[in-house]
UniProtKB/Swiss-Prot annotation:
The transmembrane segment S4 functions as a voltage-sensor and is characterized by a series of positively charged amino acids at every third position. Channel opening and closing is effected by a conformation change that affects the position and orientation of the voltage-sensor paddle formed by S3 and S4 within the membrane. A transmembrane electric field that is positive inside would push the positively charged S4 segment outwards, thereby opening the pore, while a field that is negative inside would pull the S4 segment inwards and close the pore. Residues 414-425, 426-433 dip into the membrane without crossing it. InterPro entries: BTB/POZ_dom (IPR000210), Ion_trans_dom (IPR005821), K_chnl_volt-dep_Kv (IPR003968), K_chnl_volt-dep_Kv5/Kv9 (IPR003971), SKP1/BTB/POZ_sf (IPR011333), T1-type_BTB (IPR003131), VG_K_chnl (IPR028325), Volt_channel_dom_sf (IPR027359). Belongs to the potassium channel family. S (TC 1.A.1.2) subfamily. Kv9.1/KCNS1 sub-subfamily. The keyword Transmembrane applies. Heterotetramer with KCNB1. Heterotetramer with KCNB2. Does not form homomultimers. It comes from Lemur catta. GO terms for molecular function: delayed rectifier potassium channel activity; potassium channel regulator activity. The lineage of its organism: Eukaryota, Metazoa, Chordata, Craniata, Vertebrata. This is Delayed-rectifier potassium channel regulatory subunit KCNS1. Its main location: membrane. Residues 498-529 are annotated as: Disordered. SMART domains: BTB (SM00225). It comes from the Eukaryota. GO terms for cellular component: perinuclear region of cytoplasm; plasma membrane; voltage-gated potassium channel complex.
Length: 529
């Protein structure tokens, strides 16, 4: 039975579960080094059967020569077979000649998994390590992918191939829904920008109030008012499309500019017009306030939600400019045709008000998750469109061949594309239907093919949306909890907050955690493998 003789401090963490502790009465004895004479192996500086003392990241272990001899190609196997101290020093980071101990500045958790490899001959993947960090550790110790156990090899290779892609595409990894500390630290870095700014403390408070709905009671009230204004604007736009308002708009179109009034003044209902002005004033206030309070102007214009805010108010001001141009050109004798074209442009600008509904994404986790899903699912969307294009082309050609003699709307293959699209997506409006047996069989195949083809990418997109939603909720919870601790500390401090102070706090916290991990146990016991 393979025995690994171990002596040293006990590393209390989750990785120690890989190696079961030995009975308390287990003892280890090291063969004495002869006082004179050369060992049988011809190695002048240590015996060939002498146990190897190693210290990896503070974890001290003593490995038997017989265990290392089974794997001579590994780093420890080559270290055991080293012919001289100089050759051995090339394989380790440091060597203590007095204690005859080799030191390696490597990950201690992987070393415990390495001990398990020397005992069983199989290496298991550690979920605590990044796939690239695990690969680097395995390469350093001289282990290849063939050393991986069969239960972990497929998962390791899959993660290694998928890891270069963005973090949002690792939706199959359960831990990927946890909030990323870098994402939380981005908010801290944004707050630190106010340290050297003018009125930084006040701007910092106002910015957090507008950007973080869970920051304080005023921020929650501001969020509720903003949602109410967005809903009121959408309701006013919908009411304006009712028949009675359309009739009034048609009557206003007959009016000429000779009366000295703008068509907008005649067309719009006074109540709706006042409500529209109020909504525009509120939206303009939001955009200008966020622009003035933003810690970085460049980052402000790069944020998608801020661009949505700008687009929501842009149509109103463009329509206003068009109306001013319409009134000015009227006195200059503008023709009716030119006025008609300008009026169509105004209508397009008014139609752009529908984008105001996207402002709700600032207050909705689901909408933000949907936007992130669409942004990072372009591969799946491309596959979906490719499947639909192939299916529509094939079944449209079959339907055209079967129904071209009938007067049912299948006159050309491009005319059949509409029928193929609504059939493959299982919408089935019924405006165009086949009447022959061959056409009905083609329609049945089109519907069944659509169910099978469309369902595959949709499932992937849905899983990705679920992943994004869980991640967004976890990130919001982490930022909210961090707001109760770190944000309050920042706001109560002086304006001289800097990145250096934040870095010092992180280093202090890290030193405290390292001290807890590296603290030796009161009575370490040897272990046997």
């Amino acid at each position: 039975m393979l025995m690994l003789l171990v002596r040293g401090t006990h590393f209390e963490n989750n990785w120690s579960k890989l190696i079961p502790p030995a009975p308390l009465d287990a003892t280890v004895s090291e063969p004495p080094v002869p006082d004179s004479g050369e060992p049988d192996s011809g190695v002048p500086w240590r015996r060939s059967d002498e146990a190897l003392r190693v210290n990896v990241g503070g974890v001290r272990r003593r490995l038997s020569a017989r265990a290392l001899a089974r794997f001579p190609g590994t780093r420890l196997g080559r270290l055991q077979a080293a012919k001289s101290e100089e050759q051995a020093r090339r394989l380790c980071d440091d060597y203590d000649a007095a204690a005859r101990e080799f030191y390696f500045d490597r990950h201690p958790g992987f070393f415990l998994s390495l001990l398990h490899f020397y005992r069983t001959g199989r290496l298991h993947v550690l979920d605590e390590l990044c796939v690239f960090a695990f690969g680097q550790e395995a390469d350093y110790w001289g282990l290849g992918e063939n050393a991986l156990a069969a239960c972990c090899r497929a998962r390791y290779l899959e993660r290694r191939v998928a890891r270069p892609r963005a973090w949002d595409e690792d939706s199959d990894t359960p831990s990927s829904v946890d909030p990323n500390p870098d994402e939380i630290s981005d908010v801290q870095r944004e707050l630190a920008r106010y340290g050297a700014a003018r009125c930084g403390r006040l701007r910092r408070r106002l910015w957090l109030t507008m950007e973080n709905p869970g920051y304080s009671l005023p921020s929650k009230l501001f969020s509720c008012v903003s949602i109410g204004v967005v809903l009121a604007s959408i309701a006013a736009m919908c009411i304006h499309s009712l028949p009675e308002y359309q009739a009034r708009e048609a009557a206003a179109a007959v009016a000429t500019v000779a009366a000295g009034r703008s068509a907008e003044d005649v067309r719009d209902d006074p109540v709706l017009r006042r409500l529209e002005y109020f909504c525009i004033a509120w939206f303009s206030f939001e955009v200008s306030s966020r622009l003035l309070l933003a810690p970085s102007t460049r980052n402000f214009f790069c944020h998608p939600l801020n661009l949505i805010d700008i687009v929501s108010v842009l149509p109103f001001y463009l329509t206003l400019l068009a109306s001013v141009a319409l009134g000015g050109n009227n006195h200059g004798g503008t023709s009716g045709e030119e006025l008609g074209h300008l009026g169509k442009v105004v209508q397009v600008f008014r139609l752009m008000r529908i984008f105001r509904v996207l402002k709700l994404a600032r207050h909705s986790t689901g909408l933000r998750s949907l936007g992130a899903t669409l942004k990072h699912s372009y591969r799946e969307v491309g596959i979906l469109l490719l499947y639909l294009a192939v299916g529509v082309s094939v079944f449209s050609g079959v339907a055209y061949t079967a129904e071209k003699e009938e007067d049912v709307g299948f006159d050309t293959i491009p005319a059949c594309w509409w029928w193929g699209t609504v059939s493959m997506t299982t919408v089935g409006y019924g405006d165009v239907v086949p009447v022959t047996l061959a056409g009905k069989l083609a329609a049945s195949g089109c519907i069944l093919g659509g169910i099978l083809v469309v369902a595959l990418p949709i499932t992937i997109i849905f899983n990705k949306f679920s992943h994004f939603y869980q991640r967004q909720k976890a990130l919001e919870a982490a930022v909210r909890n961090s707001g109760h601790r770190e944000f309050e500390d920042l706001l109560s401090s002086v304006d001289g907050v800097s990145d250096a102070s934040l870095e010092t706090s992180r280093e202090t916290s890290q030193e405290g955690r390292s001290a807890d991990l590296e603290a030796p146990s009161e009575s370490p016991k040897p272990q046997i493998y």
